[in-house]
């Protein structure tokens, strides 16, 4: 039986069965052991202690020995009657070590919080510097674009004047219309004539290119954050081409989502059916294996009987 039994002759109190009792171990000192042995109660004792030499492995129950050193109390039923397992003493840590550990944890937490605050402050400073640098860059771009705009506007005026002069040639003079107020208004033909000279054509092309560059610069200055993507059409995002059942594009509707969920459920149901079929086939194979083993055993028995008959000449 697991546990400890009292060493008093005729006493069978067990530490595993009698949980209400306490059990005491004899001390190491020989004088104390002799004193304990003298103080053992003789009530119900069927033998004598004249030749008994107690050791530290002997236990006394609280029925025959009052006091002493309490060594073992059964709290939970156990199957380990070993002294090292049942009487393992819990190593008590000093209170100072626990307090030092708590202080160390608090210091580590404070250091982590300080590091996080410093990182946040650095990020805020970087954002402020970026915000301050962006307006200055935009003003510098506009200052650089102003002379280009002036030169482009002058070139445009020159080309318009040249077209007006060419349209007022001797063969193409048209009467000026008269407004209801009586003022003469001269029409300006802005269409490009084929009879332009080579120099005028080159000047017009240069002016047009400068005008395009100036307008592009103005658009870039008005948008300091850089060129923006303008999406034209019904679909807000391009098709990435991912068409497997787990991909959800941004334009997924409720019907498509339900359809995909139903597909997944169908797949799971099919997998469950396949698993049931596999379990049935495994069970059938096991039954077949048992039958074959039984047949083999029967054949071995018959063969053994035949060999025995041959040996005995039956």
Swiss-Prot record:
GO CC, alphabetical: chromatin; cytosol; nucleoplasm
Subcellular location(s) per record: Nucleus; Cytoplasm
GO molecular function: DNA binding; DNA-binding transcription activator activity, RNA polymerase II-specific; DNA-binding transcription factor activity, RNA polymerase II-specific; DNA-binding transcription repressor activity, RNA polymerase II-specific; RNA polymerase II cis-regulatory region sequence-specific DNA binding; zinc ion binding
Zn-finger segments (THAP-type): 1-80
Function: Transcription factor, which has both transcriptional activation and repression activities. Also modulates chromatin accessibility. In complex with HCFC1 and ZNF143, regulates the expression of several genes, including AP2S1, ESCO2, OPHN1, RBL1, UBXN8 and ZNF32. May regulate the expression of genes that encode both cytoplasmic and mitochondrial ribosomal proteins. Required for normal mitochondrial development and function. Regulates mitochondrial gene expression, including that of components of the electron transport chain.
Subunit and partners: Forms homodimers. Interacts via HBM with HCFC1. Forms a complex with HCFC1 and ZNF143.
Family according to the record: Belongs to the THAP11 family.
Protein's name in the database: THAP domain-containing protein 11
Organism per entry: Homo sapiens (Human)
